[in-house]
Curated annotation (Swiss-Prot):
Name listed for the protein in its UniProt record: Urease subunit alpha
Binding site for Ni(2+) 1: H135, H137, K218, D361
Superkingdom to which the source organism belongs: Bacteria
Transmembrane stretches, start-end: none
Keyword Repeat: no
Subcellular location: Cytoplasm
Cofactor note text: Binds 2 nickel ions per subunit.
Residues of the active site: H321
């Protein structure tokens, strides 16, 4: 006998279904469910008097035939779609996206629930892949906690702590420092990978860093991003299949943008803070978004362009790059990097999909706990200033949402050779997942999973009789303690380092995963973010044009996902 319920009642009980729409936080972004993998009337839900009980939604199958964990009735937002489904986890990986239940008595079951299965309630929750921040200055280990509590589960970058070199550049220089940081990060509740220093004109100093365990190389102007250094670094990267990230020459001392592009010789490279306020050829580094071999990213202090953006940048820059306000040349260096015209254009290039990634520049002109938040603030600003994208409809912003979520998930994963392991909600990948209440999407996650274990969560008073009494704040859970870190977190290193016996040499607890397939990438491989417009930058007015069109927008004075959610 069937029973008919209203859409509202169904959504309250089982979460939204096909055609239902959800507002993301307090933004103007709306998503619409494209497909529901569950079966009406056969949904699984845990609780007293609910479906997942012995002989009902729970089967008699043994451990090897059932999921370790099922996230029920969740709304998945990923680059490939916006759908509702049950998500099954097995041995720390995503094993199935579909319909969970008891196949002995229920139809359309694609994953079994048994006595060995834990349930995470995903009803009226949004599920995303853990974020990847590929521009980390490892200045303080406490960054990892702030990153995770905004949905970041992987940190790629360089540094050795609060040293002058680390505060300015994302490099972990030399084998001793690389080994030291691999050991030190072994207890961090975070996936990590370290870039070696790429600024040298001969190959052997780079090769020894890759063999020591660097997952990539970083070129930074403060170490000298010369033609010879860029050329040499890319040649070594091609040999060992690791990515190169570059911060180019702001003052055009060793060459201009055209010289840097020539040094690249059409080889794949990741350009950091491509707009230029974070550094790079002044004023036209932003033009590299038109190059097929360049995989460009933004850092979050310029995201999005607001009435406060310019004012805060000068002091940040002086501190981070060891400059002195009483030296005129230092002040001129700083002021040359901060241009409202290129920052405004950056908003639009992000929305066009010409800038492919988002990152933080943590504690070095960027905020590690705001990568996800700033991404969606930018998407909101562009929605209200530029309107609906032509790929979307008046009913939803699904394509725009897929474009923006790819910027901090799948695209940095592809760029840095880790998309075989992480970066999306897809079968076979490690279960680094984040659950959000829609009203808090992008601002404050509810649960963060690492490798299939709950690593962090909002949690109330541990002495209370239930989990919810105040004070409710973020705390590490069991996946963030003891041996849980070993199974739930990973360290990314070069293939050459693994082949050379790094595992036996350092005896790290975390699993080491190789980076691969980084050197044949092109801009077209950046999902939903592959535009290569013809770029022009006026050297006098700093006006930016893409395919002949002037790119400009106003500075916003009010943003969502801001004071409504935070006391401080």
């Amino acid at each position: 006998m069937s029973f008919k319920v209203s859409r509202q009642t169904y959504a309250e009980l089982m979460g939204p279904t096909t055609g239902d729409r959800i507002r993301l936080a307090d933004t103007e972004l709306m998503i619409e469910i494209e497909k529901d993998f569950t079966t009406y009337g056969e949904e699984v839900k845990f609780g007293g008097g609910k479906v997942i009980r012995d002989g009902m939604g729970q089967s008699q199958h043994n451990h090897d035939q059932v999921m370790d964990t099922v996230i029920t009735n969740a709304v998945i937002i990923d680059h490939w779609g916006i759908v509702k489904a049950d998500v099954g986890l097995k041995n720390g990986r995503i094993a199935e996206i579909g319909k969970a239940g008891n196949p002995d008595i229920q139809p359309n079951v694609t994953m079994s629930i048994g006595a060995a299965t834990e349930i995470i309630a995903g009803e009226n929750m949004i599920l995303t892949a853990g974020g990847i921040d590929s521009h980390i200055h490892f200045i303080s280990p406490q960054q990892a906690e702030d990153a995770m509590m905004n949905g970041i589960t992987t940190m790629l970058g360089g540094g050795t702590g609060p040293a002058a070199g680390t505060a300015a550049t994302t490099c972990t220089p030399g084998p001793w420092h690389i080994h030291s940081m691999l050991r030190a990060s072994d207890g961090m509740v975070m996936n990590t990978g370290f870039y070696g220093k790429g600024n040298v004109s001969l190959p052997t100093p780079l090769e020894e860093q890759i063999l020591a365990g660097a997952c990539g190389l970083k070129l930074h102007e403060d170490w000298g991003s010369t033609y010879a250094a860029i050329d040499n670094c890319l040649a070594v990267a091609d040999k060992y299949d690791v990515q190169v990230a570059v911060h180019t020459d702001t003052i055009n001392e060793g060459g201009y943008l055209e010289n840097t592009i020539a040094a690249m010789k059409d080889r794949t490279i990741h350009t950091f803070h491509t707009e230029g306020a974070g550094g790079g050829h002044a004023p036209d580094i932003i033009a590299v978004v038109g190059q097929e071999n360049v995989l460009p990213s933004s850092t979050n202090p310029t995201r999005p362009y607001t009435i406060n953006t310019l004012d805060e940048h000068l002091d940040m820059l002086m501190v981070c790059h060891h400059l002195h306000a009483n030296i005129p040349e230092d002040l001129a260096f700083a002021e040359s990097r901060i241009r409202k015209e290129t920052i405004a254009a950056e908003d639009i290039l992000q929305d066009m999909g010409a800038i492919s990634m988002m990152s933080s520049d943590s504690q070095a002109m960027g905020r590690i706990g705001e990568v996800v938040l700033r991404t969606w603030q930018t998407a909101h600003k562009m929605k209200i200033q530029r309107g609906t994208l032509q790929e979307d409809t008046s009913k939803n912003d699904n394509f725009r949402v897929k474009r923006y979520i790819a910027k901090y998930t799948i695209n940095p994963a592809i760029t840095h050779g880790i998309s075989h392991a992480l970066g999306s909600v897809e079968v076979g990948k490690y279960a680094d997942l984040v659950l959000w209440r829609p009203a808090f999407f992008g601002v404050k996650p509810s649960v963060i999973l690492k490798g299939g274990m709950i690593a962090a969560s909002l949690m109330g008073d541990p002495n209370a009789s239930i989990p919810t009494p105040q004070p409710v704040h973020y705390r590490y859970m069991f996946g963030g303690y003891g041996g849980g870190i070993k199974t739930s977190c990973f360290t990314f290193v070069s293939q050459a380092a693994l082949a050379a016996g790094l595992v036996d040499q350092l005896k790290l607890d975390k699993n080491l995963i190789e980076v691969k397939n980084t050197r044949n990438l092109r801009k077209k491989d950046m999902i939903h973010n592959s535009a290569t417009p013809k770029m022009e930058v006026d050297p006098e007015t700093y006006e930016v044009r893409a395919d002949g069109q002037l790119l400009t927008c106003g500075a916003e004075d009010v943003l969502p996902m801001a004071q409504r959610y935070f006391l401080f």
